[in-house]
Amino acid sequence: MTLHADAVRTLSDWTGPTSHESALREEYLAALRDVSATSRTRAAGHLTASALVVDPYQRRMLLLLHRLVGLWLPMGGHCEPSDRTLADVALREATEESGIASLSLLPGPVALDRHPVPCRPTGNSVHLDVAYVAVTPPGAVESLSDESLDLQWFSLDGVAPEPTDDAVRRLVERARMLLPV
């Protein structure tokens, strides 16, 4: 199966928990009528994947301070030719940006978000992001990559750090509901 086919299947099978995300799902599926929708070269907007990295043992989440947008965000980014699924994209990005090996994804996407970004090579573009939750192994140690200004653990039960955005707050709420207390 190709990444494009997986994206169509994943989004077709996903039920948006809100009317806003149901509308986003339809927008993503419309974008996927163009086979280049998983490529960063598509200026009209392209699919990306992200993962909120959580440590369920210490009830904490790992966020990065994004170099370009200056917000605390989950790990995530563009699809690469070697990726076979959206889950692969999310897991690869989470591993690269957190430095944590042996992450595992909870099943299925947990949120969708559409956001404008300064994106190479197209200049300003739109990311059609599919978000997952990645779980750390016990005793995981993070490592800052050169893509971020900072990398920090925050309480999963506290408020999301500032500055961030509503999509991150929604993702954190969903992660809380998926993890055992």
What label would you give each PLM region?
Residues M1-E27, S98:
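Predominantly extracellular/luminal regions of secreted and cell-surface proteins
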Residues T15-S50:
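Acidic, metal-coordinating catalytic segment for phosphate/diphosphate chemistry
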Residues H46, H66, H78, H115, ...:
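Histidine-centered active-site/metal-ligand motif
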Residues E142-E173:
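NUDIX/MutT-family hydrolases
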Residues R59-I100, D157:
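Conserved Nudix-box catalytic region and its N-terminal flanking loop in Nudix hydrolases
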Residues V53, V133-V135, W153-S155:
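Short, well-ordered beta-strand micro-motif
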Residues G99-A140:
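Active-site segment of metal-dependent pyrophosphate-handling enzymes
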